Amino acid sequence: MAAFVVNGTPVTVEKNQKLIRYLRDELHLTSVKDGCSEGACGTCHVLIDGKPTKACIPQTDKLEGKHIVTVEGLSAFEKEAFTYAFGEAGAVQCGFCIPGMVISAKGLIDQNPDPTREEAAFAIRNNICRCTGYVKIIDGILLAAKILREGKIPEKKEDFQVGSRVHRIDVAEKVQGYGKYPDDIYVDGMCYGGAVRSQYPRARVLYIRTKEAEALPGVVCVLTAKDIPGQQNVGHIQKDQPTLIGEGEITQYLGDAVALVCARDLETLEQAKKLVRVVYEELPAVYGPEEASAPGAPEVIMGNRGNLQAHRHVVRGNAEEAIKHSKYVLHEKFETPWTEHAFLEPECCVALPLENGGVKLLTTDQSAHTTQHECSAMLGVDFAHCQVENMLVGGGFGGKEDMSVQHHAALIAYIARVPVKVKLTRQESLLVHPKRHPMWMDFTMGCDENGIIQGVKASVVSDTGGFASLGGPVLERACTHAAGPYHYENFEIEGHAYYTNNPPAGAFRGFGVTQTCFATETLLNEMADLVGISPWEIRYRNAIRPGEVLPNGQIVGPETGLVETLEAIKPYYDEAVKNGEPVGLACAMKNAGVGVGLPDYGRCKLVIGDDGKVHIRAGASCIGQGLGTVLVQLVVTNAKLTRDQVVYDGNSTFITPDSGDTSGSRQTLVTGEACRRACLLLRDAMEYRSLSDLKGQEFYGEYYAKTNPLGANVPNPVSHVAYGYATQMCILDKETGKIKKMVAAHDVGKAINPLSCEGQIEGGVVMSMGYALTEQYPLDHGKPTAKYGTLGLFRSHQIPEIKAIVIDKPGLNLANGAIGIGEITSIPTAPAIAQAYYRYDGERRRSLPLDHTPYKK
């Protein structure tokens, strides 16, 4: 027992427990986020006697007489100051790390009211952010310090026109910690669910015994595969991910669930899981594409006739002949690793029984409607009996596209008729959700005497792990974009993705392009040296320009801005070369929208509510990219309204039309265009009537992004409705070899909110600095050996200067000219860094993370 003070209120805690559990589960102070419970991420920071401390570390019995402050306990002025400062700086994206950042910032400012930038960065060194790259968070801390010193909060600008630098609409709830992520939901009678997972990557489940677990007091139910009323398998495209592995069936990887346990409290849940007895027959497994493709290899998916998950072959022109006649030819092999998304919010879902016998899911994912489709099929019910509502989503980057906890929560609530929360531990999260594919690449490039690319021929092999996830589309995108953003005709690439008994691989920011771009751009840097021209010059000569044809045959439109990104970066490049600094350069392109002939709809309803305001309803997940703010800006601009006349209602399958997954850099473009079309209808209706006259009316907009399938027999197929382009540059410190500065110029079409665009660029650059230099997801016979704190994520005090350049080049006649930017920000970073290190020490590096750098000895 211990007595201490929380936010000015004395409390007595009878039961010894981690402080985070008391603050969250008993006091419901939801600003104290549970990102890892391992002392690694910093989302649970609180002040203990004025010192920032991770609440997942101390036990309550050790806190006698202490004074604890959470964000909820800050003064009204402090809350307002941090909210304004973080909004003005653009510091908030997914928001899950932000309350912890605020606490660390307050701890600093209380001791040092006028900190330097370096001091602010050091103060948050124990707080990880995966979205922002820390730059704008540090800006926000410095602005908050200024406001707190001066005692006055500036007036917030309310210009929400497209192109304005605006505060995101969800800043206050994320800064102050009252916005609800699924783990922040507490309802009366709520139970806790979890999975008993396989002990072996590949084994036959001989039998499962649940009686001992079921007999434990406080256990509600124990479910196995025989309890599933509908389809056993889920899957984003291929239905090859078992909800539960049944008796007699074979596990595919260590994350496979064999039973689900539901209990009245977390302690009982963990006890009961240990009482479920499972007997296995361990079987031979495969842990890489070479093993998986060998004759007679064990099948990962029974009945699949081998382990080939996907095959793609992209051909245009005659690459082999073009290379044969090239003046210069290079042939090299490249390798990129597994990497983990490391979003701050672990997967969580709260499932509530409905009166109609169905369930409602409060969840964190990248598409509420996809979750609805998969869970309703698993339950064997229609959509009315399986409703899904997105709460706030604490980051995704592709890692929350697949089912992780939603189907398990749905099954428990449906069978047991109790509200239940299912949340992955951080170690479960590291195991269960799909990662970035490791790839092995073989590239040959030919150029003429002027450095003009004549042809590229390549092969790609990827490991897609224990189930398909998005392995096929990722492989396809890796292949189609391997040609680079250049104007030449002869291109051939063949790709193979293999099932293995490793954890699954799927969508990850860049969607396969990050891997092949490393190969293409590294080879192009080597080619520049061979030809005798600069890396900048070889790109400028080959760069795709409006009206020209990409290697895939698509004619690009007037919005194409690769040349502008090169020109924007040139002064920085020339200055670095002049100063003798090691400098590297790389370009990239990335599609916006699904493309390649697949259905790709954006949908949006504008509903005039009883409050006389326009309510935006679009079935698209906001995972930190700021979609809600984008849609509000589009409505204000296109419907000619003021900010206070517009409300963003969020994403719920019960009220919003399906706008597809938040992936492929598609939502700003596709759902943004649907929103614009709805605005035009509303504007017409408002010509002779006021909003109050239109109460109850709905205005529906839909956009279908029509494209041609891969291999379409047309002269100039449209693979994607739009592409974004980028050039990034890395400058190293000549003395230390560490990164001194990153410059990133990105063509975004029309920047809806330039402040958000800068934040996306900075965050993507830092994420791929990790990809290039420090991050790894090591496996030992299919078992992850890293913890969150050992993944190699960059921290705030390690970040160099980052110059984000937003190239505003309208021209696309969709969504006010906007093109998605979420993925491309992380694509050209690694090859730019690799080239800088070549200039530093003369060593060519063709695998990631890069060897022999100050970051990795």
What are these regions (language model features)?
Residues 124-182, 566-569, 576, 582, ...:
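Intrinsic disorder at enzyme termini
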Residues 225-226, 381-385, 415-420, 449, ...:
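C-terminal catalytic domains of large/alpha subunits in multi-subunit enzymes
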Residues 1-156, 596:
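Signature of N-terminal electron-transfer/Fe-S-associated modules in redox systems
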Residues 46, 173, 179, 348-353, ...:
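Short beta-strand elements
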Residues 257, 264-265, 418-465, 673-692:
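Phosphate/diphosphate-binding loops
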Residues 145-308, 329, 415:
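Flexible, low-hydrophobicity surface segments
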Residues 90, 164, 170-176, 306-349, ...:
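Glycine-rich loop/linker segments at domain edges
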Residues 296-379, 543-613, 633, 693-718, ...:
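Helix-loop-helix junctions that connect adjacent transmembrane helices in secondary transporters/permeases
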